[in-house]
Amino acid sequence: ELNRIIVKSFLEKDLPAVQLSTRAFVYKRGGEVVISPEPLRSLIDREIIPVSFGDVILSDKDFEILSGDELAWRSALILGADIVFFASTVDGVYDKPPEKGGRKIIEKIKISKETNIVLEGSRHIDVTGGMYTKIYSGIDVLKRGVKGFIFNGEVPGNIYKALTGEKIVGTVVEY
């Protein structure tokens, strides 16, 4: 449902977009996510925005769940992106769990053992792991120089500002 809303929003702004089923171009082999880049590149070459999502995908064992976050990281790598944007419902990664008062946004996270301590409290946020998984599912991609940026996509204008390089509140993640 969310995917259709996103595609509809793009189309209403005269931005050509199409829903691309994750199962049509992604599978897992030997525990590794394999993305067939042709569908993505073909749409991008035609200036059409592919909109995909986390889903159940085929694997050599059976079926597995692939989060939208991991899909974004892996797609960025095969497409040669420098940064992955994560529009969230919060302003970024906080220095304390949500239930603790006086929390502050961490502007930049450089992955280290200490990072694990900060993110442990966020595992409960959603079924695929919350902020912890959002960041750690991209470790291999981060190691290759791709950055992540987590920001609040519900703030009007934030998505546009993030994509055009304007300064907004959020968390940069790098290795």
Spans of model-derived segments:
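C-terminal catalytic "cap/lid" subdomain
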Residues: 1-175
